[in-house]
Amino acid sequence: MNLKEKTRALFAEIFSYPATHTIQAPGRVNLIGEHTDYNDGFVLPCAIDYQTVISCAPRDDRTVRVIAADYDNQVEEFSLDAPIVTHDSQQWSNYVRGVVKHLQQRNNAFGGVDMVISGNVPQGAGLSSSASLEVAVGTVFQQLYHLPLDGAQIALNGQEAENQFVGCNCGIMDQLISALGKKDHALLIDCRTLGAKAVSMPKGVAVVIINSNFKRTLVGSEYNTRREQCETGARFFQQPALRDVSLEAFNAVASELDPVVAKRVRHVLSENARTVEAASALEKGDLQRMGQLMAESHASMRDDFEITVPQIDTLVDIVKATIGDQGGVRMTGGGFGGCVVALIPEDLVPAVRQAVAQQYEAKTGIKETFYVCKPSQGAGQC
């Protein structure tokens, strides 16, 4: 039974009437463009075929009722006429509450909803299960009540809910790609303007995500330190963001910067350039050049931004040794663990899976998780 069938069946069973709509919103993986989003730079993610699915129907009152199928059918209920506050024990429900609260501030022309939620985006793997949930909930209200909100506004609403209501800092990329993703394409997103350009993916290429399953510990504090270092760099150049600094301008005065800040700045500037070039390489179907850019990106994250760990570097080395120049591999996500992403010809997937299975656990003592994904459509009815 797929997620649509599961949520529709559960909806009818619990609410004793049929759902009118089923909405999905996907998770995502970032192919290249790491730690560039909060520097007003470029990212190149694609939506993946793991998603949050919600079967739903409008109510004729002001109550929102939610069933979380993945949490033992926990029930959540709140009124649109009372102040929406955080739930003490059900963390999942705060994503729903936050999205609805921020939607009210944008456009209050909606009533109550019954919904059943289920998803298969792996949690804690850096594949944006939370953004997928936020965008799915926003799309439910937009579709049921014909709200005049586009995908970018639904994405911004989700980001606000996560930052201000749930209390977790994030850029806009995760929600934007979940809302705007296009089947068989990646999106080159300009994080300053939120402009997005669809980039076609070469035929016969698989998006492979391998979770190192190394438990991330430093990610919060180190993330904030990296942001501060980037802001220090932008101030040195008297620019609003590192997006506005050229590599030439940086190279001319790099020796005057604090050495650590200089390394952080160099990563962001070079990563922005790589990301724009990667979009053009993908569009041309030049997997070899894409692989070189992904290798440079990983080296920059390892040596200049210093956010990889030995387990991640080991995974990258195993994959690279298997595929040679027929594709690329790099760490993806915030760093200090998490996943690597590889773009490889579909016929090489079994060899990569086997090499990783034979070598990674032997070298690190940790068993990986292996996902083969397809670039998928963004949020909407399913």
Swiss-Prot record:
Pathway: Carbohydrate metabolism; galactose metabolism. It catalyses: alpha-D-galactose + ATP = alpha-D-galactose 1-phosphate + ADP + H(+). One of its GO terms (biological process) is galactose metabolic process. InterPro entries: Galactokinase, Galactokinase_bac, Galactokinase_CS, GalKase_N, GHMP_kinase_C_dom, GHMP_kinase_C_sf, GHMP_kinase_N_dom, GHMP_knse_ATP-bd_CS. SUPFAM superfamilies: GHMP Kinase, C-terminal domain, Ribosomal protein S5 domain 2-like. GO terms for cellular component: cytosol. The keyword Magnesium applies. Substrate binds at E34, H35, T36, D37, Y223. The record marks R28 as: Transition state stabilizer. Keywords: ATP-binding, Carbohydrate metabolism, Cytoplasm, Galactose metabolism, Kinase, Magnesium, Metal-binding, Nucleotide-binding, Transferase. The active site is at D174. Its EC number is 2.7.1.6. It is found in: Cytoplasm. Pfam families: GalKase_gal_bdg (PF10509), GHMP_kinases_C (PF08544), GHMP_kinases_N (PF00288). NCBIfam families: gal_kin, PRK05101.1. Belongs to the GHMP kinase family. GalK subfamily. Catalyzes the transfer of the gamma-phosphate of ATP to D-galactose to form alpha-D-galactose-1-phosphate (Gal-1-P). This is Galactokinase. It comes from Salmonella choleraesuis (strain SC-B67). The gene is galK.
